[in-house]
């Protein structure tokens, strides 16, 4: 490979010539020859093992050439060059570079068979193609084309423009085809998928032009795809589209599951509601006799009943709407008023598109429910026509369908994004690794050169450096980041404070002095260094980098210290280095460690550590360097600015060819890494530099300098910041005070205020510029921001005289963002949004392209239809508001779909343009735009989100000026308080000594370590109200404010013994005064710190309102003495033991709750009644329990304690809570009519109150006040009981009707809250919520700030413009503006009293009203009316005109993007992160496990929970056994499943208006299925006998079959009184769950279902909490809104009159659906909308609402339910999805273990937990992957060394462990886990204990092999002996007498005996065949075969028996076995 590595620099660019092509062909031939010779298997395998060569990432086509290669010479730009990538050395390719150094790769084969790479035409085409102007031209053409396409009614001449565009696109494609070739080879035209798009666009253009294809506008729509060409032109967009396509691929499983679930729900809906929505209230009629069925009504006659029923004039309309009133015939459905009857008539609602009449419409309705679009309308229609009970169906669909499935889509998209991010990070790390290796090589070579004494000193000149600049945009963003984190202190030195990674970092002339030594180059550990090394978190910018040419790495900033390579010699003519040859130096790009000015002078920080900043440290590892707080700043450096003097080896050092070649090869590896240098080292132009020095840094004369110093002292003081912050808040308040109908004085005051604030901010800017100099002032982002706002404010002042420029006034609102400077959360959130918007730059572009394309498609396809058929959808004859006639309106419709509202506009579209096309377009926009792209937005938002920043944003120890100022104020106040107190005490007591002692005390440092002594009583009993422990007087060292004494650190959360506290105590208990003063003087003289109270306890005590909390008894103190460490000394104060000047340390509420002692603790005796403070003040509280009265009291307390602690008591109280809550539900509008119930409830109420008061008293006595009132849950009980008690007393005294008492009674609705503490599940959720409250409140506040800007803007734009004049007789529509122009005209025309000037109820008349309007817009409920009013508004108090102010839509679009998409989704982010944090706190185990360990742990966890089950025994009867075999086969299950699905299909075919024949056929098919399923049931029962009922699925099937049979027989009766029994068949679909396990391909769906199963327990808890919230709110609603007028969303069925109706309403608005409709009637305050004097049944008057209560009620409910509870639901699903995905990616899943045991049952039918060793091989083969070990598997199984017990049996756990280990791989961690799991298994299954293993499979194999070897040796020995003896005998017989004297070899023994016996009986010679039969002993194979032939013999027996088998005593056998 070495010869392929190209040299760096311009020498690497070689023209592509014919010789080059020949060389490539030669290399290809060589490669082929090599490939042909290496044919053997081994070499092929070896090649596979080697890493196949891959193309270099940084040399890919369309990437920028890496900087390492330098700038190509001008003459080579646009010319064919040899390919730089070694990968292509054996492929016919060449590259071309353009001016921007972008790489274009071409095929070197002939284009179009004719044009070779050297053909002039092709060369010209290539030159044109790579030129940047060419792509610019195409880009401009596309954009211009888009503008023309967006015209809805183009003039005739545009046709010629169209031809021009087509010509340009044709030219572009022609150039590409000529340059690249058409399609045969790589890199040709059609090999790029983006070119397919171009090609199809051109083909379509010509087709439509020359061929008449009918509907031209439809084909013209294809032109819009040209907009997609922008993606192919801008390379950055390609990555995004890649991510989108990836996420769509990942969505496949979710889509399948979604379609399946929706189909099931649609089927259920079809069965339940088919035809219901056509039931309407029809006017009564009479049928006329004697005619042909004609009917009469109201004196009119209709020809037939059908005609009458289809006449819309006969239907009753819903109040105030054009909707028909639906009704139903069931008891709880909607009813019709007098004169109407409920009949099935006419078409379905919403143009006939909302129905459950066929499967398709039902599916659409369910999809609409899932996306929650306008679902409240469907919900109300269905409940009205079918009955309220079906709310359950909607709950299931909303919670399982909508929340679960939609959020699964989010989870999958987020995960796809995350994976892509991880891949990018991995790729970058790979480059990093290669870079490190290259560094090592270079370092070694450099050391070698240094040792040889080569002169490596050289000058560096930047002009020769090839490092190209990074984009301006990136540099700016980095500067912004730096400045926002920097300090404002400019310092006096003349150096700008820029990091070395930012700003202009030109190294002009770096003096390079001494050579590099070894020591300077050794890598340093970061421990002793002034820098702390850390890896920067990987951001999300990599994937979505904004720069079009950026690679993934450019946006990673963890590569900041890199080696800048030296260029090699340019080969000059003489071969000597040219005069210009030089090398750039090595730059240490540390973060925050050096400053560089414009001239390139670099000063290093922290000069004390020479080694860290030594010139040689350019080879430091690439890390981000952080400066710890104690690093000195440049102005403090003793040595002043230093020069950076790096060392660079000269090129001459590489004169030897070997060294040079090595360096070359090393450098060539660096390509990818060096491309990612942080920034260019470009020098500022000297003229700018001089300009900055002269004009932007003002240091003219000493007088000016002193003025400047003084101004700086004032401006930089923390108090100045505090003042400015207060001004910002005040200014915001002033802006928020603007409202409609202001008085002149008020308006004037606001104007003066504005002038004042503008003056203040201008002055601040001016002073800061004076103090800092403009040069330094504008280095800070905040200052630039301030200056822009000030300039805009001044412009507004100047222009305000000219006219109403309220837009400029809106810019003042940006001042609110200045709060971010001192409000960390706001800062964090702005950063999050900034990061997302930055990362989303490209995604936004893609979304814009999608919106544009769909808007144009909609306009082209449907525009004409909207204008021609407008009468179908609009009564007024005007165009409807939502149409596609022009581009702007089409864009609005697409945007509305992205907001999730698609169904209503789709109905309109379907009405004018036909169903199929509209469905296709709208659902495409919905799925692509809303579900995928917007979820990608959300995924990005969540990924750039970190709750650490939100919950504890200021942990970096740097205090901002605001905190410093507040700390200073606090200190001042404390000083004033103390001196005042001392003064008063001195006068009162006349005790002069005390202050003196005190002074000594106060001067002591508060951090002296003191031995702990028991606290003096006074110190211990400081009342919490007086504690100052949360505040702190001083900061850390080095952060002191001016005028401080030496820094002192004060521990926080410690009961400090401040003097005033002690003296207050002395006042109260004079008896202990002497003792106290002694102890105090002891503390002072001994230098001891007062007793430190335990932190957690003091926190609890501070939060309670009693004075009790802080005390601890002597025993407690001794206990703490043992456990608590000593108070830390000053030097080692722990981080959390002092608060950095902050106003207060926030207590974590969740921790607090956990620290509150639970009442249910098992303590033997009650605690003290009172706190010790109370006892000291009132000695009478102290009772002596040893004496008589006290003894009785103590006994009483113990008895009470026993009662309260008893479990029955708690159960009784829970029962009473539930009863009392239930009683509240009966107090509805009808209570007055039901006298008995009313009386009963009154008595019950009293009884409950008594019970709860008694419970409270019992607990007081049992627990004592101290314990009772330090428990938050007890406080809750106490307050709720108080409410009941007060209302009871008021009733008794007759004050029940008083207003305050009435409103207090409604607080009884809080009773159910008492159940919270009693139910564990709910308590867990509440604790989690309470933990999240601080961050939720933070986000809520930030949202309010964000919204405040939009609200104020809304007030500026729309205040007073939402009014209109209406005529009451004509409904709520405004009159035409030509009739009534404004409010005064309306009032003057109002002669009849029927004209009213009214406002839209929700408006922008003030900031509060604006907030409500924005909430409706953000939740997309009621936003239409607000937008219509805004768009129609003309002027102040003027009559609106249709779409007069059209572009006001843009205000709402912008608000929806920032106010809704971002801010509302931040809630999800906060909640998810809180969950993760709490998990970290609780689940510590995971954090300390390696990934490997976790993998084993999870596998073992699953493993331990299983054990073998006894299978159902096979019947003995032959026929039963046969059936049993069939029934237990998997195929049988699959067949039945298939039949179930078929049954579902037949059910889907049903429709409401089907013909009688169809009904008949379906009934027969249904009977057939009933018969089949009955047959299945009978067959299974026959096979399985009584075991059939041991499986719950079988019982379920049995019930369904019985119901089906009963349903078929009694169908008429059942359908009349119940619902259709076919419904049960739908439930059968649940059986699909069983099949999913068997289908390996369904793994993804199994994961999703598994995630749901994991979520269920948590979701149940959240559901309970949600129910509780709904219950409480419904009680409140009944109390406040029962008599509100029926209009908008409130009617006879959905109202707050009864508990059930309230619950219907609240369930609906849980998803925020339709809350605007419910709120609307409550906002009515008087005529003409409601009547305040209407009498009600309970004695109250009026049907008006109370707006304040209503708004509070609905907004709090929406925030609690929609934003918190529902988002918790989402968080849990996301969390569990990621867990389930992790589980599914693990090698072994739960299913694998299930399958193992299922197969085990077949091998171990008795469930003994053992199988025979001989069956092991078959068992291993029978398993499914990944546990399966396919045959032949003997060797693998033997190697596992499985333990065997007697009887050659192996335990299932041993096998499972071994197989698991095989899958997961060897690991040391396995053994410990195995032991742990075995213990667990032993406990669960005692059967294994009695069997001790006697051998293992491996040892058994060893024994068998040993036995075989011994046997063979012995046989060989025997054979030799027998051969000898045989030959002797042969000779004896054949040889005659001469041999008779010969002795026999063996005279005795087995062989002699047998042979002699044989030969004595037989004299005939043996045949040759018998000789060969036993010549050789059995082979090794036969032994192993015998083993496998199921012989149940043990090893020891085995060897013996084989020996004997060879020599049986039978004579016949002997005869056969011997020669």
Curated annotation (Swiss-Prot):
Fill in the domain comment. The sequence contains 4 internal repeats, each with 5 hydrophobic segments (S1, S2, S3, S5, S6) and one positively charged segment (S4). Segments S4 are probably the voltage-sensors and are characterized by a series of positively charged amino acids at every third position.
Where in or outside the cell it occurs: the entry states: Cell membrane; Cytoplasm, Perinuclear region; Cell membrane, Sarcolemma, T-tubule; Cell junction
Locate the compositionally biased regions of type Basic and acidic residues.
42-53, 492-504, 1018-1037
Would the keyword rRNA processing be found if you checked this record's keyword annotation?
no
Q: Which residues carry this modification: Phosphoserine?
A: 37, 458, 461, 484-485, 498, 511, 540, 572, 665, 668, 1505
- Glycosylated residues in this chain: 215, 284, 289, 292, 319, 329, 741, 804, 865, 1367, 1376, 1382, 1390
UniProt keywords, alphabetically = Calmodulin-binding, Cell junction, Cell membrane, Cytoplasm, Disulfide bond, Glycoprotein, Ion channel, Ion transport, Membrane, Methylation, Phosphoprotein, Repeat, Sodium, Sodium channel, Sodium transport, Transmembrane, Transmembrane helix, Transport, Ubl conjugation, Voltage-gated channel
Coiled-coil annotation reads none
Protein purpose: Pore-forming subunit of Nav1.5, a voltage-gated sodium (Nav) channel that directly mediates the depolarizing phase of action potentials in excitable membranes. Navs, also called VGSCs (voltage-gated sodium channels) or VDSCs (voltage-dependent sodium channels), operate by switching between closed and open conformations depending on the voltage difference across the membrane. In the open conformation they allow Na(+) ions to selectively pass through the pore, along their electrochemical gradient.
Question: What's in the GO CC field?
Answer: axon; caveola; cell surface; endoplasmic reticulum; intercalated disc; lateral plasma membrane; membrane; perinuclear region of cytoplasm
Kindly provide the intramembrane ranges recorded for this chain: 359-379, 888-906, 1403-1424, 1700-1716
Upper lineage: Eukaryota, Metazoa, Chordata, Craniata, Vertebrata
Q: Can you state the subunit structure given in the record? A: Cannot form the same regulatory interactions with beta subunits as other Navs do. Interacts with the PDZ domain of the syntrophin SNTA1, SNTB1 and SNTB2. Interacts with NEDD4, NEDD4L, WWP2 and GPD1L. Interacts with CALM. Interacts with FGF13; the interaction is direct and may regulate SNC5A density at membranes and function. May also interact with FGF12 and FGF14. Interacts with ANK3. Interacts with PKP2 (via N-terminus). Interacts with TMEM233. Interacts with XIRP2; the interaction is required for normal action potential configuration in the heart.
Q: Where are the II repeats?
A: 700-972
Kindly report every residue range on the membrane side named Extracellular.
151-158, 211-217, 274-358, 380-387, 739-747, 798-807, 862-887, 907-915, 1228-1238, 1294-1299, 1358-1402, 1425-1447, 1550-1560, 1615-1621, 1682-1699, 1717-1747
Acidic residues bias: where? 1057-1074
Report the protein name in the record: Sodium channel protein type 5 subunit alpha
The gene designation is: Scn5a
Q: Name one GO molecular function term.
A: voltage-gated sodium channel activity involved in cardiac muscle cell action potential
Tissue expr = Strongly expressed in the heart. Also expressed in adult and fetal brain, spinal cord, testis, and at moderate levels in kidney, adrenal gland, lung, skeletal muscle, spleen, stomach and bladder.
């Amino acid at each position: 490979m070495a010869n392929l590595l190209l040299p760096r620099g311009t020498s690497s660019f070689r023209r592509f010539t014919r010789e080059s092509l020949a060389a490539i062909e030669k290399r290809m031939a060589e490669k082929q020859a090599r490939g042909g010779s290496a044919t053997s298997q081994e070499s092929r395998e070896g090649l596979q093992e080697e890493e196949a060569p891959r193309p270099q990432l940084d040399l890919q086509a369309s990437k920028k050439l890496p900087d390492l290669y330098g700038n190509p010479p001008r003459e080579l730009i646009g010319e064919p060059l040899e390919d730089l990538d070694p990968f292509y050395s054996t492929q016919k390719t060449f590259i071309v570079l353009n001016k921007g150094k972008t790489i274009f790769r071409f095929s070197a084969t002939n284009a179009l068979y004719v044009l070779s790479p050297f053909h002039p035409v092709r060369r010209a085409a290539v030159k044109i193609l790579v030129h940047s102007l060419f792509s610019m031209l195409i880009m401009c053409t596309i954009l211009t084309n888009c503008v023309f396409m967006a015209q809805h009614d183009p003039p005739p001449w545009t046709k010629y423009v169209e031809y021009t565009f087509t010509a340009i696109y044709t030219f572009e494609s022609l150039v590409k085809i000529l340059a690249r070739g058409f399609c045969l080879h790589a890199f040709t035209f059609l090999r790029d998928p983006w070119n397919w798009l171009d090609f199809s666009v051109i083909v379509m253009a010509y087709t439509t032009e020359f061929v008449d294809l009918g509907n031209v506008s439809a084909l013209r729509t294809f032109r819009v795809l040209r907009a997609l060409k922008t993606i192919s032109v801008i390379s950055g967009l390609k990555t995004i589209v890649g991510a989108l396509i990836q996420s769509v691929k990942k969505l496949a499983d979710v889509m399948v599951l979604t379609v399946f679930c929706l189909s099931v729900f649609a089927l259920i809906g079809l069965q339940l509601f088919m035809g219901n929505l056509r039931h309407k209230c029809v006017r009564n009629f009479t049928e006329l006799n004697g005619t042909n069925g004609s009917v009469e009504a109201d004196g009119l006659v209709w020809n037939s009943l059908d005609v009458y029923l289809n006449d819309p004039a006969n239907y009753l309309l819903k109040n105030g709407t054009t909707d028909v009133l639906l009704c139903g015939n069931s008891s709880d459905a909607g009813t019709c008023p007098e004169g109407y009857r409920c009949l099935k008539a006419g078409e379905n609602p919403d143009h006939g598109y909302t129905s459950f009449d066929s499967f398709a419409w039902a599916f659409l309705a369910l999809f609409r429910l899932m996306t929650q679009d306008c679902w409240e309308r469907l919900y109300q229609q269905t409940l009205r026509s079918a009955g309220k009970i079906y709310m359950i169906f909607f709950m299931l669909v909303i919670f399982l369908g909508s929340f679960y499935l939609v959020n699964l889509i989010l989870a999958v998209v987020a995960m796809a994004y995350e994976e892509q991010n991880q891949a990018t990070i991995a790729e970058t790390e790979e480059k990093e690794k290669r870079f490190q290796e290259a560094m090592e090589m270079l370092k070694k070579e450099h050391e070698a050169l240094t040792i040889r004494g080569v002169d490596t000193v050289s000058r560096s000149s930047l002009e020769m450096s090839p490092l190209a600049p990074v984009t301006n945009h990136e540099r700016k963003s980095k500067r912004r980041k730096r400045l926002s984190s920097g300090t404002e202190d400019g310092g006096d030195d003349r150096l700008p404070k820029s990091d070395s990674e930012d700003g202009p970092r030109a190294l002009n002339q770096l003096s390079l002095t001494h050579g590099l030594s070894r020591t300077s180059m050794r890598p340093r550990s970061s421990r002793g260094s002034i820098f702390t090394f850390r890896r920067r978190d990987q951001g999300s910018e990599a994937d979505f980098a904004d720069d079009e040419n950026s690679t993934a790495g450019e946006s990673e900033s963890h590569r900041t210290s890199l080696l800048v390579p030296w260029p090699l010699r340019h080969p000059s003519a003489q071969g000597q280095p040219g005069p210009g040859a030089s090398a750039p130096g090595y730059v240490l790009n540390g973060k925050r460690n050096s400053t560089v000015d414009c001239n390139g002078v670099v000063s290093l920080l922290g000069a004390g550590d020479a080694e860290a900043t030594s010139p040689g440290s350019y080879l430091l590892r690439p890390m981000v360097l952080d400066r710890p707080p104690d690093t000195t700043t440049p102005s403090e450096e003793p040595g002043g600015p230093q020069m950076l003097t790096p060392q660079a080896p000269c090129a001459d050092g590489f004169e030897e060819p070997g060294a040079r070649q090595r360096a070359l090869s090393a450098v060539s590896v660096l390509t990818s890494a060096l491309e990612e240098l942080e920034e260019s080292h470009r020098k500022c132009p000297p003229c700018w530099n001089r300009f900055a020095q002269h004009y932007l840094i003002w240091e003219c004369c000493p007088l000016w300098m002193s003025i400047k110093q003084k101004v700086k002292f004032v401006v930089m003081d923390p108090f100045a910041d505090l003042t400015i912050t207060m001004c910002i808040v005040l200014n915001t308040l002033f802006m928020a005070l603007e409202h409609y109908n202001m008085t002149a004085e008020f308006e004037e005051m606001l104007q003066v205020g504005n002038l004042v604030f503008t003056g203040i901010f201008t002055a601040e800017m001016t002073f800061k510029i004076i103090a800092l100099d403009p040069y330094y002032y504008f280095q800070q982002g905040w200052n630039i921001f301030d200056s822009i706002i000030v300039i805009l404010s001044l412009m507004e002042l100047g222009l305000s005289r000219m006219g109403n420029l309220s837009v400029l006034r809106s810019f003042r609102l940006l001042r609110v963002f200045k709060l971010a400077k001192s409000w960390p959360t706001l800062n964090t959130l702005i950063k999050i949004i900034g990061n997302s918007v930055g990362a989303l730059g490209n995604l936004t572009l893609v979304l814009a392209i999608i919106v544009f394309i769909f808007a144009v498609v909609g306009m082209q396809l449907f525009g004409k239809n909207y204008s021609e058929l407008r009468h179908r959808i609009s009564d007024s004859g005007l165009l409807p508001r939502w149409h596609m006639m022009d581009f702007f309106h089409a864009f609005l419709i697409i945007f509305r779909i992205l907001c999730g509202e698609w169904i209503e506009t789709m109905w309109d579209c379907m009405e004018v343009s036909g169903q199929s096309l509209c469905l296709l377009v709208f659902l495409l926009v919905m799925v692509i735009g809303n579900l995928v792209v917007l979820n990608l937005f959300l995924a990005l938002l969540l990924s750039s989100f970190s709750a650490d920043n939100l919950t504890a944003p200021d942990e970096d120890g740097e205090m901002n000026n605001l905190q410093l100022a507040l700390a200073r104020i606090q200190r001042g106040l404390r000083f004033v308080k103390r001196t005042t107190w001392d003064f008063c005490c001195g006068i009162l007591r006349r005790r002069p000594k005390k202050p003196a002692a005190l002074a000594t005390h106060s001067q002591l440092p508060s951090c002296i370590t003191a031995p702990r002594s028991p606290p003096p009583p006074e110190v211990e009993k400081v009342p919490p109200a007086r504690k100052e422990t949360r505040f702190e007087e001083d900061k850390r060292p080095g952060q002191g404010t001016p005028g401080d004494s030496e820094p002192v650190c004060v521990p926080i959360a410690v009961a400090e013994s401040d003097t005033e506290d002690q003296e207050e105590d002395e006042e109260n208990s004079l008896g202990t005064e002497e003792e106290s003063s002694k102890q105090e003087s002891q503390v002072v003289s001994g230098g001891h710190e007062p007793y430190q109270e335990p932190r957690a306890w003091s926190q609890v005590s501070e939060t309670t309102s009693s004075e009790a909390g802080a005390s601890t008894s002597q025993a407690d103190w001794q206990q703490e003495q043992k456990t608590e460490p000593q108070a830390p000394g000053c030097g080692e104060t722990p981080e959390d033991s002092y608060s950095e000047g902050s106003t207060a340390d926030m207590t974590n509420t969740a921790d607090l709750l956990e620290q509150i002692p639970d009442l249910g603790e098992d303590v033997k005796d009650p605690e003290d009644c009172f706190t010790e403070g109370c006892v000291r003040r009132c000695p009478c509280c102290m009772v002596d329990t040893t004496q008589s009265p006290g003894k009785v009291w103590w006994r009483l307390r113990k008895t009470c304690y026993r009662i309260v602690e008893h479990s029955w008591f708690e159960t009784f109280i829970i029962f009473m809570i539930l009863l009392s809550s239930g009683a509240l539900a009966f107090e509805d509008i009808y209570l007055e009519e039901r006298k008995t119930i009313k009386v009963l409830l009154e008595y019950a109420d009293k009884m409950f109150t008594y019970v709860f008061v008694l419970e409270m008293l019992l607990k007081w006595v049992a627990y004592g006040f101290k314990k009772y009132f330090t428990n938050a849950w007890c406080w809750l009980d106490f307050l709720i009981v108080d409410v009941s008690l007060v209302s009871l007393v008021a009733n008794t005294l007759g004050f029940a009707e008083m207003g305050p008492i009435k409103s207090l009674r409604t607080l009884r609705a809080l009773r159910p809250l008492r159940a919270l503490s009693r139910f564990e599940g709910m308590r867990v959720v509440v604790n989690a919520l309470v933990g999240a409250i601080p961050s939720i409140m933070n986000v809520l506040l930030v949202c309010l700030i964000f919204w405040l800007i939009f609200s104020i803007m809304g007030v500026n734009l729309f205040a007073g413009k939402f009014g209109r004049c209406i005529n009451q007789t004509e409904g709520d529509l405004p009159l035409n503006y030509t009739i009534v122009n404004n409010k005064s005209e309306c009032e003057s025309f109002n002669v009849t009293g029927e004209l009213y000037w009214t406002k839209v109820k929700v408006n922008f008349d003030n900031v509060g009203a604006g907030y409500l309007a924005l909430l409706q817009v953000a939740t997309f409920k009621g936003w239409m009316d607000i937008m219509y009013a805004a768009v129609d508004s003309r002027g102040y108090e003027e009559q609106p005109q249709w779409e007069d102010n059209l572009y006001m839509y843009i205000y709402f679009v912008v608000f929806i993007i920032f106010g809704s998409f971002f801010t509302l989704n931040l809630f999800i982010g906060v909640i998810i992160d809180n969950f993760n944090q709490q998990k970290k706190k609780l689940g510590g185990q995971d954090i300390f496990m390696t990934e490997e360990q976790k993998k084993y742990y999870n596998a073992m966890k699953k493993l331990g929970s299983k054990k073998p089950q006894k299978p159902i025994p096979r019947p003995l009867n032959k026929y039963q056994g046969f059936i049993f075999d069939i029934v237990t086969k998997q195929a049988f299950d699959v067949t039945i499943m298939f039949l179930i699905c078929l049954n579902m299909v037949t059910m889907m075919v049903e429709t409401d208006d089907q013909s009688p024949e169809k009904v008949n056929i379906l009934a027969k098919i249904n009977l057939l299925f009933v018969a089949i399923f009955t047959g299945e049931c009978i067959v299974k029962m026959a096979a399985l006998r009584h075991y059939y009922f041991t499986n719950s699925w079988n019982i379920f099937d049995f019930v369904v079959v019985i119901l089906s049979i009963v349903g078929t027989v009694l169908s008429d009766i059942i359908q009349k009184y119940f619902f259709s029994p076919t419904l049960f068949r739908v439930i059968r679909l649940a059986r699909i769950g069983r099949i999913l396990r068997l289908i390996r391909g369904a793994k993804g769906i199994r994961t999703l279902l598994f995630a749901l199963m994991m979520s269920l327990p948590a979701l149940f808890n959240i559901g309970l909490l949600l129910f509780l919230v709904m219950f409480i709110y419904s009680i409140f609603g009944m109390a406040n809104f029962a008599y509100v007028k029926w209009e908008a969303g409130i009617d006879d069925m959905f109202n707050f009159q009864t508990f059930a109706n309230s619950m219907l309403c609240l369930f609906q608005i849980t998803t925020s659906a339709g809350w605007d409709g419910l709120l609307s009637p409550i906002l009515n305050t008087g005529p003409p909308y409601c009547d305040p004097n209407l009498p009600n049944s309970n004695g109250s008057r009026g049907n008006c609402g109370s707006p304040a209560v209503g708004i509070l009620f609905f907004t709090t409910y929406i925030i609690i339910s929609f934003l918190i509870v529902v988002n918790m639901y989402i968080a849990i699903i996301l969390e569990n999805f990621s867990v389930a995905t992790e589980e599914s990616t693990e090698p072994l899943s739960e299913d694998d273990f299930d399958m193992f045991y299922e197969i085990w049952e077949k091998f171990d039918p008795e469930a003994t937990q053992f199988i025979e060793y001989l069956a092991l091989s078959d068992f291993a083969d029978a398993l499914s992957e990944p546990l399966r070990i396919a045959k032949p598997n003997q060797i693998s199984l033997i190697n596992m060394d499985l333990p065997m017990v007697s009887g050659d049996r192996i335990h299932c756990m041993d096998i499972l462990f071994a197989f698991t280990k095989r899958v997961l791989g060897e690991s040391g961690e396995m053994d410990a886990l195995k032991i742990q799991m075995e213990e667990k298994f032993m406990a669960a299954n005692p059967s294994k204990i009695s069997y001790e293993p006697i051998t293992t499979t491996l040892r058994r194999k060893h024994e068998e092999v040993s036995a075989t070897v011994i046997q063979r040796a012995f046989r060989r020995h025997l054979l030799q002996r027998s051969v000898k003896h045989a030959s002797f005998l042969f000779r004896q017989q054949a040889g005659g007498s001469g041999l008779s004297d010969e002795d026999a070899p063996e005279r005795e023994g087995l062989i002699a005996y047998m042979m002699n016996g044989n030969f004595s009986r037989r004299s005939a010679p043996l045949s040759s065949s018998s000789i060969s039969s036993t010549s050789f002993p059995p082979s090794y194979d036969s032994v192993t075969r015998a083993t496998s032939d199921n012989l149940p013999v043990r090893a020891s027996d085995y060897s013996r028996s084989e020996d004997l088998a060879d020599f049986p005593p039978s004579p016949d056998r002997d005869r056969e076995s011997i020669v």
